[in-house]
Amino acid sequence: MEKGYMISDASKMLEVENHVLRYWEEELELPIPRNELGHRFYRDSEIKLLRTVKDLKEQGFQLKAIKKLLPDLERVENMDPQMLYQLREELNGEVLREAMEHARGDRKSVV
């Protein structure tokens, strides 16, 4: 079997709590593999991906914005800081607009 890490090991490597990794997995719909006992099994590729997610979160990206970036994550990792800032502002604004539209739609259905 390929070398991997349990969630407790992965959380220590990434310096986040276990529940944060589970939350990111759920919200970003990440296909984290499981071992034969059904426990999460983080390979180096998942650790690298989650490290990038953590870095983007620390730079102010919302999870919904990060989710939109997942297909192009490798390109995003190599962006210069100014372009990354512009992308963050654009995507976070888009996420906010979508949330506001959703909230307005919910209010209309109640009235």
Where in this protein do the model-derived segments appear?
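Basic helix-turn-helix/winged-helix DNA-binding cores
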Residues: 1-71
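Charged, helix-prone or intrinsically disordered regulatory segments positioned adjacent to compact structured domains
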Residues: 45-48, 52-104
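Conserved small/polar residues in nucleotide/adenosyl-binding loops
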Residues: 108-111
